[in-house]
Amino acid sequence: MSRDSPPAFDPYKHLNITINPNGSCTRHFVWPRVEPDPDPCPGKLAASKDVTINHETGVSVRIFRPTNLPSNDNAVARLPIIIHLHGSGWILYPANSAANDRCCSQMASELTVIVVSVHYRLPPEHRLPAQYDDALDALLWVKQQVVDSTNGEPWLKDYADFSRCYICGSSNGANIAFQLALRSLDHDLTPLQIDGCVFYQPLFGGKTRTKSELKNFADPVMPVPAVDAMWELSLPVGVDRDHRYCNPLGYLPQKEKVGRLGRCLVIGYGGDTSLDRQQDFVNLLVAAGVRVEARFDDAGFHSIELVDPRRAVALLNMIRDFIS
């Protein structure tokens, strides 16, 4: 390499991680974390509490409810449930990060819903399908709360409408949400009813480069080499990006189940590295006969709602329209 050549791109440096000899990673940036607030002071958007749902794995959920609960005829109105899978870049930050806590608080308050945010385990310490397992544990736990008349979680038993449950995920969380929706079809969730799924900027991949990946190869938020590294650290050891966890389009047994999904909302932006794969995902759903609402905006990029408050409001409005 000549002295004038630019240095090779280091995806691990971009992600601010170091891979350890035992396969774990050191995350050099510690994302600010927020403790739950079950009894918030006046002016806060939502109350929140943490509940461990699997003592063997340590997986927990954080439940959010609006501070001001609506009422009907002097009784508290029942609120829809959103099972929320946060975007973490697979490997970077947990559900109790300040960004996700703020997102879920706003969702609970603005949409008047109960949010159950899943604190799934992170790769590479826990590779896929651990995250899918954790999400299913959370869904089955929510179902159990309504059938357990003695020990059910009070916020769910007292405030939730179990006939209106939605699965919602962002980025890799939308990937988890898709697999959770498919897995839910193998279980009797009665009396819990899944009324729809929201996939926000779903993260999928594959070995063959798409036009949007080539166009946005050096994207400052999601450069393709960094996304490749995320998949490398998240997928089961020994598989490539055409594995069904990353690239669901070619997996025929899964396609039959896709047609049994309820209505879906898919949201994306033109500047997203994953745009083409998101649109292919919409085509997969449509071809299977799923009722799909696709909302793509040419202007925008991955995680734009974190830096543009107007886009955050627009996102909430799209979800509100879908669940109302």
Swiss-Prot record:
Q: List the disulfide bonds.
A: none
Reactions catalysed, as given in the entry: a carboxylic ester + H2O = an alcohol + a carboxylate + H(+)
Any Pfam family the entry gives: Abhydrolase_3
Hydrolase recorded as keyword: yes
Q: Where, by tissue, is this protein expressed?
A: Expressed in flowers.
Q: Which domain of life is it from?
A: Eukaryota
Q: What class of enzyme is it?
A: hydrolase
Keywords in alphabetical order? Hydrolase, Serine esterase
A single Gene Ontology MF term assigned here is: carboxylesterase activity
Intervals of motif Involved in the stabilization of the negatively charged intermediate by the formation of the oxyanion hole: 86-88
Q: What is its EC number?
A: 3.1.1.1
Residues forming the catalytic site: 171, 272, 302
**Main role?**
Carboxylesterase acting on esters with varying acyl chain length.
Q: Which family does it belong to?
A: Belongs to the 'GDXG' lipolytic enzyme family.
Q: What is this protein called in UniProt?
A: Probable carboxylesterase 9
What organism does the record attribute this protein to?
A: Arabidopsis thaliana
In the UniProt record, what gene is named as encoding this protein?
CXE9
